[in-house]
Amino acid sequence: MALDLFKRVETRKGLFAVEKITLIYNLLTSILILFLFQRMDHPWHMLLDRAMIAAMTFLLMYLYRLAPCKFSAFVRIVIQMSLLSYWYPDTFEFNRFFPNLDHVFATAEEFIFNGQPAIWFCHTFPHLIVSEAFNMGYFFYYPMMLIVALFYFIYKFEWFEKMSFVLVTSFFI
């Protein structure tokens, strides 16, 4: 099976959808940092990181124009997906400033379901194998995304960009 990594790909010029959503998230969180600037631990560092991410995104777009092939598309998209490991702990910085709303959601669950579905599930499936399966899911969160991305890159390249957009956007939402 030939991947033809360096075969020229005819594609539109400009940002991929996954890069656009990342830049939008980058901009929105930068604005949030500016509003919370005085209360944050390291706002300058966070803003500098965001500027470097934006610069890197545009640099990769420019390099892709020089060599539009599967490999350069892969690099552009995988770098955006790998940034999820940066964005995830970054959300902790913002969540420190917002009140805990768990009680609101627990009350809504009580109202909608007349109970707590998570507790029902735990009582229905108390087996160790079930909890281990969930732990395995958390453990393989990022590797699973990489496996899915590689599958689409190798076997369904025409869907690779859309799949990465869906994964990254669902993370941001």
Residue ranges of each PLM-predicted region?
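Terminal transmembrane helix and immediately flanking juxtamembrane interfaces
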Residues: 1-173
